[in-house]
Amino acid sequence: MGLHLSANRGEAARAWALVAAQFAILVALLVWSPAPDFRPPRWLQRAADYAGVAGALWLVLGLVSLGRSATALPLPVAHGRLRTGGLYRLSRHPIYTGLLALGWSWAVGAAAYGSLALAAALTALLWAKARFEEAALARTYPGYVDYAERTPRFLPLGFRLRRSFPRLPGAGRG
């Protein structure tokens, strides 16, 4: 983990708040064990199990791809470079995608409404964290906006529901 590019105090505080919230939700998902509220259909449980395994693999490969540039903070590191190959050709945020798959897999396995609510909270938080990080990446790397327009944020699906990366003021093509 390396030093981050200079960020103003407000931006750094928001970055740390996002990391703290992510950590709190993940810990809550892992340690809270409410009584089951429902019994998921077998097919859903099996799909969730496969998604969890795939998510763990996706997360690890994303971390390995970043190497020394890996950081929990949604800010570019000083020695980093824009990664657009490998897993990052399929998804702009493979680590977040892996966390989402693991979180939802865990929540379905717990079969509790509270766990599903935590997975939904993790989804909303990682969406916000990705948007925050993308703004910083667009300011740092001239080619980021073009990369973001052709690469899905999370899921490497063959279709796009809508343009997922709005043009940022001052973020030119590179």
Which residues make up each language-model segment?
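Membrane-anchoring alpha-helices and their flanking helix-loop junctions
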Residues: 1-84, 98-174
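Histidine-centered phosphotransfer motif of kinases
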Residues: 85, 89-97
